[in-house]
Amino acid sequence: MFLTAVNPQPLSTPSWQIETKYSTKVLTGNWMEERRKFTRDTDKTPQSIYRKEYIPFPDHRPDQISRWYGKRKVEGLPYKHLITHHQEPPHRYLISTYDDHYNRHGYNPGLPPLRTWNGQKLLWLPEKSDFPLLAPPTNYGLYEQLKQRQLTPKAGLKQSTYTSSYPRPPLCAMSWREHAVPVPPHRLHPLPHF
């Protein structure tokens, strides 16, 4: 005999008592309304694992030396170590590597034409970065031109950068056609043949 009960029928139960036992998962009563009720386990505020296991030390003071080392590590090198090069004054090493490569085409009279391999340091010496160009930067007067444009007062309406920098096209580039292209009437269109 096959039963649909959750637990099999014990042997002590008589065979004539064959009512099926319903499982506890059967929904009875006002299960829809009871399902929407929120029952809190405790009235206390829930505690996280960190809060439960945290041990306070009231007389603890933070380690200032560790903080100082961490702060120095995050800040990195100071400005004088990043910018200064062999104690040169700042007005003499203003040429960047980009400017040297693209505008001056690698011209540096202080460097020999060929580099040699140093087996002890495992480097090609001398490096270009060790001998920076000691001259003012190549700016082609762009800074002075921009400063002059910003300092001269302009009278009249204010214009956007796009309007002021957009050149007016020549008159020959304009189209002199005053009317739209004529469209033939519908009666002159050929009928489609299927």
Swiss-Prot record:
Listed name of the protein: Cilia- and flagella-associated protein 107
Subcellular location, record wording:
Cytoplasm, Cytoskeleton, Cilium axoneme; Cytoplasm, Cytoskeleton, Flagellum axoneme
InterPro entries in the record: CFAP107 (IPR054709), CFAP68/107 (IPR037662)
Listed Pfam families: CFAP107
User: What does UniProt list as this organism's lineage?
Assistant: Eukaryota, Metazoa, Chordata, Craniata, Vertebrata
Q: What does this protein do?
A: Microtubule inner protein (MIP) part of the dynein-decorated doublet microtubules (DMTs) in cilia axoneme, which is required for motile cilia beating.
A GO cellular-component term linked to this record: axonemal microtubule
Q: What is the annotated tissue distribution of the protein whose record heads this document?
A: Expressed in airway epithelial cells.
